[in-house]
């Protein structure tokens, strides 16, 4: 018999039912579970797949550049970034008919096009790209990198070029390489690009390979560097009347500490960003020389961790045994990496709007909203993944003997206390926040809005004041006009910071009140509950009170009810599954809050948010209902407008989302019976019965159906909100 899919598992390949296909797909990337896997092949497969991942990323970014150069309007956008709408790419077949063709022909294009809400135009413009030729060059370069990555991935699977296990487990060398080689050198290279290409570009000087060696980025060249007069590089910065991309009002400084925003572009000063990247480069280049490799100098990670034993015995044996535990578990390493990346992605969301780095992006409201929402959802998925792999670590890799009485073992020892504290925090936040919202709802319904319970967030306002926001009237730190910090700030450091904090047109330290206080606690409820589910799933992965022997059941077993001995103290997979719903819910609140607050800020009617956000009906009526009207009118009896694609996506998103419930709220036996009925009818129908299948059709397993339901729920949820977000924002601000 020919080898059947999946080749990596002979047991599955011989399964006579359709389970073979679904389980094969589900375990295709679980290299550890494959038949003849060795530790060495496991590491080599993962290493090679990283190159494949890089190749896909480079190909994708190359495609962005290529399509904008081919079908976009980058050159005309550069002439007038505030009034020309950036085009992402052409649309082949706008739906439906001539009205749609006319509706989607915009941005100065000859035919129907999609508008770009990704911010790439602003990014490319800021870093010095100006022409379609520049974009094509970038696309070709990235295509070349993509090919190189593919070749490298293939090469490292060849016997001669396969790295050994010892190479993969050489943590110090990897740390040095990543700190110095990746972060340090790339930050230094980026500083170089900003200083040599982007900053001259922002001052109307076009630097390319042909004049790269002739144009001095600073009038004094490298002189100040060698004579120690570094302050000369900060003198004569761009003036507040500087027109970006021209020499009008431009200075000569390349590394500054101005603070605040460029008045015309509303983005951070390029010279501040160059300075920032130079500092980062310096720190990481130093950090990458700290660990002991071939030369016998520097720190040993293992020695550092073994020495970390807190005094007084309060944390037992501290970090003893952690080095080998982490270094020998790829799930632990992946969990740490995902946790870090998730936090960073969320920080990117928060900083991209409050401290915009790209010229004119702050005035492109739809792009701001899209980027914030995108990065928060990505962060949510990555963070939940961190806990999933933490749970797999406890099941597959954790060795109690190796970790006796260290911080890891002690987490397991007092997990009941951790769970109960998180549970208490979640219950407290949930009941109190809902109680306040519902009370306020009732007061408005009874026509007595003055009886609402409105709490000023005085601690948060105090923190904002300490950073220089004066409108609350706190006389503290940077908002205290006669304090030494305030006066020093005027001249020595970041003179533009205080102006930026107190100018109400940007998103830096938005004024907050009772509505913010309430939604902040609603979000805190979501965060704590999601964390509770995820932490419980990981800490109970090996065993729990009701089911002490989970380890041999593996990561994902179904809840089978009490009939077969009872596995209803859920599997670690089940915890991940439940947590994703909470994660989506929480980020829903986060994005609703961000979007509504900003819509009212951009429209100049902040009182709408302040007055309506203190009760639930306000959110439903004045945010969701009010802002969905343009969207729902994408198609109407009079024809089609340019929001019709979002109206369609909004409907389609609801469809996908609702389909999820078919898999989530259902009995497996119902599907099994339905499938057998259909198979029976098929086999007895003329013509149809000529077509046979090799695998006996069976219903999805409980875990599989949950996964399919979860995938539909997530995708539909995000499609629906993305359509709402883009249509409601672009419908208002064009």
Swiss-Prot record:
InterPro entries: PSI_PsaA/B, PSI_PsaA/B_CS, PSI_PsaA/B_sf, PSI_PsaB. It is an enzyme of class 1 (oxidoreductase). [4Fe-4S] cluster binds at residues 559, 568. Keywords: 4Fe-4S, Chlorophyll, Chloroplast, Chromophore, Electron transport, Iron, Iron-sulfur, Magnesium, Membrane, Metal-binding, Oxidoreductase, Photosynthesis, Photosystem I, Plastid, Thylakoid, Transmembrane, Transmembrane helix, Transport. Chlorophyll a B1 binds at residue 654. It catalyses: reduced [plastocyanin] + hnu + oxidized [2Fe-2S]-[ferredoxin] = oxidized [plastocyanin] + reduced [2Fe-2S]-[ferredoxin]. One of its GO terms (biological process) is photosynthesis. It is found in: Plastid, Chloroplast thylakoid membrane. Chlorophyll a B3 binds at residues 662, 670. The chain crosses the membrane at residues 46-69, 135-158, 175-199, 273-291, 330-353, 369-395, 417-439, 517-535, 575-596, 643-665, 707-727. The keyword Metal-binding applies. GO terms for cellular component: chloroplast thylakoid membrane; photosystem I. P700 is a chlorophyll a/chlorophyll a' dimer, A0 is one or more chlorophyll a, A1 is one or both phylloquinones and FX is a shared 4Fe-4S iron-sulfur center. It is a multi-pass membrane protein. GO terms for molecular function: 4 iron, 4 sulfur cluster binding; chlorophyll binding; electron transfer activity; magnesium ion binding; oxidoreductase activity. Its EC number is 1.97.1.12. Phylloquinone binds at residue 671. The PsaA/B heterodimer binds the P700 chlorophyll special pair and subsequent electron acceptors. PSI consists of a core antenna complex that captures photons, and an electron transfer chain that converts photonic excitation into a charge separation. The eukaryotic PSI reaction center is composed of at least 11 subunits. PANTHER family: OUTER MEMBRANE PROTEIN, OMPA-RELATED, PHOTOSYSTEM I P700 CHLOROPHYLL A APOPROTEIN A1-RELATED. Belongs to the PsaA/PsaB family. NCBIfam families: psaB (TIGR01336). PsaA and PsaB bind P700, the primary electron donor of photosystem I (PSI), as well as the electron acceptors A0, A1 and FX. PSI is a plastocyanin-ferredoxin oxidoreductase, converting photonic excitation into a charge separation, which transfers an electron from the donor P700 chlorophyll pair to the spectroscopically characterized acceptors A0, A1, FX, FA and FB in turn. Oxidized P700 is reduced on the lumenal side of the thylakoid membrane by plastocyanin. This is Photosystem I P700 chlorophyll a apoprotein A2. It comes from Chloranthus spicatus.
